[in-house]
C-alpha cells in the first residue's frame, strides 16, 4: 500500500517528469516507461494515479493552467484599488510568469494546443483557459470602455499575449519580458486612450 501522504508527492513527481520528458522528446514520443523512469517509479504507479498516458497529460495540463491562474491572482490581489492599466498589466505579467515561459512549460503548451484539436478533454481545458483570459481582460477594460469596445480590446490583448508567447516558444530563445511589457503597455494605453467618460455606460 502507498504510504499515507505520498499521493501529492507522487503526483508532483510524475507531472514534473512528464514536463521534462515532453521538453526532450515531445508529447507524441513521450512514453509511460520514459516518464516513470525519469520520475524514479514503476510504470504501474502511473496507472495507479492517472490510469493511462492521456490521464497523466490531462493532469499535467491542469497543473500548468492552475499555476497560470495562481500567477495572475497573486499579481491582482494587492491591486484591488489600482488603475485599470495597472491591473491589465498585472494580468499580462501573470501570463508571462516564470511557470509559463520556461522551456518545458512552453513546449508542453505547444503540444497541448496541437493535441487539443484531437483530444476532447484537452480541448475542453484549452477552451476554458482561453475563455478565462478573455473574460478577465474584458472585465478590466469594461471599467473604462463601452461593452463592445471592451470586448474588442480584450480580444486584441489576448491575441497579443498569445502571439508574443507563441513567437518566443517557436524561436527557442528565452522569453523577453521587457519587450512583451513594452508592446502590451502600448496596446493597453492605446485602447484606454479612446475611452470617453460619457461612453463608459451603455
Swiss-Prot record:
Residue ranges the UniProt entry marks as DNA-binding: 31-50
GO biological process assignments: glycine betaine biosynthetic process from choline; negative regulation of DNA-templated transcription
Domain HTH tetR-type residue range list: 8-68
GO molecular function, one term: transcription cis-regulatory region binding
Pfam families attached to this UniProt entry: TetR_C_6, TetR_N
Pathway where it operates: Amine and polyamine biosynthesis; betaine biosynthesis via choline pathway [regulation]
Keyword entries, A-Z: DNA-binding, Repressor, Transcription, Transcription regulation
Ranges annotated as spanning the membrane: none
SUPFAM superfamilies: Homeodomain-like, Tetracyclin repressor-like, C-terminal domain
Record PANTHER family: HTH-TYPE TRANSCRIPTIONAL REGULATOR BETI (PTHR30055:SF234), HTH-TYPE TRANSCRIPTIONAL REGULATOR RUTR (PTHR30055)
HAMAP family on file: HTH_type_BetI (MF_00768)
Main function: Repressor involved in the biosynthesis of the osmoprotectant glycine betaine. It represses transcription of the choline transporter BetT and the genes of BetAB involved in the synthesis of glycine betaine.
Name of this protein: HTH-type transcriptional regulator BetI
Species this chain originates from: Cronobacter sakazakii (strain ATCC BAA-894)
Name of the gene this protein is made from: betI
